[in-house]
Design a protein with these regions (language model features):
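Extreme N-terminal tail/first-helix region
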Residues: 1-19
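Short, contiguous alpha-helical
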Residues: 34-87, 127-170
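Residues that form generic nucleotide/phosphate-binding pockets
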Residues: 13, 24, 65, 91, ...
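Acidic/His metal-coordination segments adjacent to aromatic residues that form catalytic metal sites
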Residues: 2-6, 88-103, 137-146
Length: 170
């Protein structure tokens, strides 16, 4: 497992994730990206919106740490991240399903920008020190490595194989 111990490594991972997703979007093309059914009942656009929603959580965590606050997540307050995963994913879908692809892609890019900006500006102590924030009870790593690892694994393990298979189907 790749270890992230520097700001430069974290930024590199985020930039590689962006480049890989951008390449998949370019390969798919706009017409194919919005067709339902490529991912169960979902379109590639829906998958991008899902990834964007969770990247928004990454941005919220990083930005909250800049204010030394706990993060506030985009979904309704009654939903809990560790408990209501399917409901949160459904909320992401319902919130984004009627948006045009161009808006979904713009929001995706904005979340990447926010994550990169936060990683670039957070003090190293806040970014890399394990145990610095009490609300990161789900990881033994510092905030930066924890959230970047989560974003990377979410894409690479849970979604990239399906995206690659779908792209190969042409």
């Amino acid at each position: 497992m790749e270890e992230f111990t520097t700001r430069a490594q974290l930024l590199d991972v985020v930039r590689r994730l962006r480049a890989d997703l951008d390449a998949a979007v370019a390969e798919a093309g706009a017409e194919r990206a919005v067709q339902p059914g490529g991912f169960d009942e979902l379109s590639f656009k829906d998958v991008i919106a899902h990834l964007t929603g969770w990247r928004l959580v990454t941005a919220a965590r990083l930005e909250a740490s800049m204010r030394d606050e706990e993060p506030v997540f985009p979904w309704p307050e009654h939903l809990e991240e560790g408990v209501d995963l399917h409901a949160i994913n459904r909320w992401f879908y319902e919130t984004n399903r009627d948006k045009p692809l161009e808006q979904i892609l713009a929001e995706s890019n904005e979340t990447f920008d926010r994550v990169e900006r936060a990683i670039a500006t957070l003090p190293e102590d806040a970014l890399l020190t394990p145990g610095r924030f009490d609300w990161i009870s789900w990881s033994d790593h510092g905030l930066g490595p924890a959230v970047v690892r989560g974003a990377m694994d979410h894409y690479r393990v849970e979604h990239e194989p399906d995206i690659r298979a779908w792209l190969q189907q042409g």
